[in-house]
Amino acid sequence: MSDHLSPEQVDDEFFAALTAGDVSRLEPLLDERFLIVDIMSGAVADRAALTAALAERVLEFERVELIERAGRHYGETAILVGRTEMAGSFAGAAFTAASRYTHVFVRGADTRWRLASAQGSHDREA
């Protein structure tokens, strides 16, 4: 993976890694202090919990389709807001969701952008 990916490219890689269930591809994209708010339950999970759920196949994504995205950059921080449609399973139960998301990226000392926070909400307009 290039060290010079934009936040938008890291976002694309994040969705691709989720769909592939590829933890080794996902881990370099995530900040060490990464947190995610689950779209279905509203629960907060850290990097270790997300990667474990994917590695153990508790969480699987059949597809994550990006519908739209807009971004703002503020120095060493970038915020992307977008819409996705996704399908997968959690603990064996199938799910589908149309979501709006906010992803916050930070640029580290090594100049690489990493996803620091992800928040998903149901898209009522979908």
Predicted features, each with a name:
Residues 1-27, 35-126:
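A beta-strand edge to alpha-helix "cap/lid" segment located at domain peripheries
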